[in-house]
Amino acid sequence: MIIPNKFLKLDYNPTYDVLFVEWPNMHDYTMPEVTYIIDEVIEAVRSYDIKRILTDTRQSKVTVPMEEYAKIINQLALQLATTRLQKFAKLNTRDADREAVSSNAAALVVGSITYSSFDDLDEAVAWLIES
């Protein structure tokens, strides 16, 4: 089931209660859209009472400074921790700095959300849907 959104694809599988998010590009000129996108993801998680998210960050480009990127990702993690989300899986990029930001954000919500990153889509899905 596709959840309507102007800026990104939110594909929800109610059978497994998994929301698939194709992560957007982040450039200085797209920051207002990125803020909107984060709000939309949080709203979808709340509205559909989603328990699992899979984000695909492999193709997204980030040109904002890492400090700004970290602030955004930390904000997302902290907002997700206020929902009933249980598991968050991420498909890895090849950017070590971005992966470090993701790991740091995950550390902010330890105990609230279980986080894992993967290189393989099938492994990520299997991890999300296991009990």
Feature names for model-found ranges:
Residues 2-131:
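Amphipathic, Lys/Arg-enriched alpha-helical "gate/interface" segment within cytosolic domains
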